């Protein structure tokens, strides 16, 4: 990997060299300057204070405790990635599989209305967030709305932080979550987001 990187790096001066990782060694040795860690492998990156640090969750589908966007998951579990990213100080999210309506390696196409798992490639829902509509348009899924909610949650918490500071914001989130919220342990019910939004609106009303 290092040899391949060194081969092309001189031609990419000034560009961001990013890659999706599961092994911290690539960041530790400086082979990848902008690592994008899978959520189930994030902890070593967080412990080392890697910055900038992005995350993604495709590939975490075999890890039942982690968030994702599988059809079998409640929307609250999909949406949770935003609050998790805020608390962990993650800089960005790698989003793949917007409209991947193919089998593994794209050998064939699939009908996403009939095959949510892309011919057995990944768990249903992992490979796409939209469905084909008329005249080349995209039909949004509920999972896409949940992902938008996740990004809006980050903006909401950043606004709260601008009024009350980081420490109080984190304490408020953890209080509503029942004391614990990380990438492996987190609320999975919609009520958490209703309570969180209500608290933010109430506290910020006079600002």
Q: What is each PLM-predicted segment?
A:
Residues 1-106:
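Catalytic-core regions of glycoside hydrolase
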Residues 2-23, 90, 106-207:
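Catalytic domains of carbohydrate-active enzymes that cleave complex glycans
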């Amino acid at each position: 990997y290092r040899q391949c990187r060194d081969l092309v790096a001189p031609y990419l001066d000034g560009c961001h060299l990013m890659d999706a990782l599961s092994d911290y060694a690539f960041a530790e040795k400086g082979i990848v300057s902008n690592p994008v860690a899978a959520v189930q492998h994030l902890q070593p990156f967080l412990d080392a204070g890697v910055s900038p640090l992005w995350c993604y969750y495709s590939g975490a589908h075999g890890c039942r405790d982690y968030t994702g966007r599988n059809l079998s998951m409640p929307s609250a579990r999909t949406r949770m990635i935003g609050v998790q990213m805020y608390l962990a100080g993650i800089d960005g999210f790698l989003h793949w599989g917007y409209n991947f309506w193919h089998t593994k390696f794209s050998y064939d196409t699939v009908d996403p209305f009939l095959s949510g798992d892309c011919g057995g490639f990944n768990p249903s829902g992992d490979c796409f967030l939209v469905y084909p509509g008329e005249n080349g348009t995209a039909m949004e899924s509920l999972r896409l709305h949940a992902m938008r909610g996740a990004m809006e949650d980050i903006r909401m918490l950043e606004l709260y932080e601008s009024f009350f500071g980081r420490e109080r914001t984190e304490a408020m989130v953890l209080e509503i979550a029942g004391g614990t919220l990380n990438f492996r342990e987190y609320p999975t019910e919609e009520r958490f987001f209703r309570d969180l939004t209500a608290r933010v609106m109430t506290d910020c009303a006079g600002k």
